[in-house]
Amino acid sequence: MNEKIIIFDTTLRDGEQALLTSLTSNEKIQIALALERLGVDVIEVGFPVSSPGDFKSVQMLSKIIKNSKICSLARCLPNDITIAADAMQFSKNFRIHLFLGTSDLHVSSKLKKNFNEIIEMAVASVKQAKKFTNDIEFSCEDAGRTTLQNLYCIIEAVIKAGATTVNIPDTVGYTTPTQFKKIITMLFNHVKNIHQAIISVHCHNDLGMAVANSISAVEAGVRQIEGTMNGLGERAGNAALEEVIMTLNVHKNSLKVSTDINIKEIHRTSKIVSQFCNTPIPLNKAIIGKNVFSHSSGIHQDGVLKNRKNYEIIDPNSIGFTDYCSLNLTSRSGRAAVKHHMKKMGYENSDYNLNELYIDFLKLADKKGRIFDYDLEALAFFKKQQNTEEYYKLEYFDVQSKLSGLSTAYIVLICGSQTNIQKATTYNGPVDAIYQALNKATLYSIVLKKFHLEANGEGKDALGKVNIIVQYKLRNFHGVGLATDIIEASAQAMVNVLNYIWKSQQVNKELERLQK
């Protein structure tokens, strides 16, 4: 039977320390509830002595969290321990997490003590914490740079004093997986009473090895891993729990371990943390990045179409991923991907010439970069429109905004070679006003689904790049605009979309003609 690995989440404590602004009470509640749904065993919710606000947050969460064990951090100081316990008084199931520097550097330069004094402080603190709870975790801060002999001594002492979990942090992300595994192995071989406590690890990512170090520690016998969702944390962050969890899941048979995590909640939890912490998830972020389950190479796309397992070791649906794009159409895509997208749109092989379509597809992909389904349709059934000028052109626009938030937009839109349409609308904000005016001008009933703004370059002359996705007749269309003025970039993006919609309509007309 596989042994259970305890998952200890410190997103609300160590993760929050990395944020530019503190989380609000409601944001902390939403993240805590998401972590509970995920099935995290222990949630470290704060450092109560650090501020009155943190104390109140811990107190609030101690009333809300029911299924996971709640935990608070405390230095090995009497006042810290009392305040930590007081903050969690409303919880029936809490842990006090004590920490104290143990490396020569921390002992001498930070704490200004000798190691015997460190052991005395640690033992006294564990004994004090036992007055409030039987669940006590002790962390040897900077264990990765602590001499093994000192680790043996302090771990044996705190376990004897009543610590139920002993944490071995690689506080500055210094060790390699081989080195860290050796440290853990040596502890199990030399600390006499080590089996009387759960041994835990808390790895930082300064050298990019936090997850690898955590897994190597499991191989050595560790039964608790600490980390944060999305790898949040000071400096380079902590071990990313979603990566730890899925590594344990994928290799559960060889590692002979398991967790109580509901992996179906991983994607949702990650998005909640990303949203509230204002930390975008990189496209290529392991497990949760949008590119993880997307394929652009023609060879890979062909392999995925035959069997997803050829190039995917995780089923995206198993972790709650629903909004991923499986096959990106680029100049690297092969015929199999083009054929797959046409079939997905409902077209049979007999409806078009695949070889001709693929030749035209490559030409357009070299110019445009990424190709969408409506581009394929246009190439297959109305190829000539790809070489025509844009039907809609924005001749002029002006936006007047008021402090009330209302903005009035006036636009002049050229339609085809002759028609000029002039429209004015008042709406909430300048971008919405522009979009509503363009909507009225074209009579397209479209819904803005996504708006993304990013800077291309630095300083005041940087270009604003706007990417949008709109829905028209249950179909998504993509648009891009680039300008030093973000309102102009937004307008260009919408006009870009309007042209795609117009071209799509011409394709439909051509299909109707061919069917007659």
Curated annotation (Swiss-Prot):
Pathway: Amino-acid biosynthesis; L-leucine biosynthesis; L-leucine from 3-methyl-2-oxobutanoate: step 1/4. SMART domains: LeuA_dimer. One of its GO terms (cellular component) is cytosol. Residues 5-267 form the Pyruvate carboxyltransferase domain. The keyword Nucleus does not apply. Its cofactor is Mn(2+). Belongs to the alpha-IPM synthase/homocitrate synthase family. LeuA type 1 subfamily. Catalyzes the condensation of the acetyl group of acetyl-CoA with 3-methyl-2-oxobutanoate (2-ketoisovalerate) to form 3-carboxy-3-hydroxy-4-methylpentanoate (2-isopropylmalate). This is 2-isopropylmalate synthase. It comes from Buchnera aphidicola subsp. Cinara cedri (strain Cc). The lineage of its organism: Bacteria, Pseudomonadati, Pseudomonadota, Gammaproteobacteria, Enterobacterales. The gene is leuA.
